[in-house]
Amino acid sequence: MKNLLAVIGIAIVFTYVIGSGLWVNTGDNWYRTLNAPSWQPPPAIFGIIWPYNFIILGIAAVTIAQRAATTTTLIYLTFFALSVACALTWAFQFYRPHNLSFAALALVGTVLLTIPMTVIAFRTSIGLGVALLPYQIWVAIAANLSYTYSRLN
């Protein structure tokens, strides 16, 4: 059962990676015409943080599946899947129909859903919880960034 749950966790990460790749497009003309927040991180930061986030999410899913009780793992994976659904809703709403306000709300959902994930990670392993904190912080920054985009545009 633990191996199956680990595979499900990895599948959620792959869904996140593939979905993000399908919808996020910062190179198109529409995105370039947006008024960007003055505090937006430079593109290089995105190139560093996202690979880290995807890797640590995979490590967290496998570690929790292997070390935590089955019920705890199922709770973690449920919050993880829902948070990814919200994050992908953001990507779609922001870059396809350009619904910036709804996109920002979707990221707020991601932020809220990652809180119990981080708590479970800390309860499983202090080191794992610490390693997952950058993701929690990043989605909070992203939600604020998305909200600011919706206000400016």
Question: Where are the predicted features?
Answer:
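Membrane-interface loop-to-helix entry segments
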Residues: P42-I55, H98-L112
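Helix-adjacent hinge/juxtasegments
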Residues: I55, I59-A91
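Non-cytosolic membrane-interface motifs at loop->transmembrane helix junctions
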Residues: L34-S38, L100-G109, G129-L132
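Membrane-interface helix termini and inter-helical loops of multi-pass transporters
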Residues: T26-S38, A65-T70
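Terminal transmembrane helical module of multi-pass membrane proteins
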Residues: R123-N153
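N-terminal signal-anchor transmembrane alpha helix
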Residues: M1-L22
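Membrane-interface helix caps and helix-loop-helix hairpins in membrane proteins
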Residues: A69-T71, F92-S101, F122-I126, Y149-N153
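Hydrophobic alpha-helical segments of small multi-pass membrane proteins
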Residues: F80-L88, A104-M117, Y135-V139
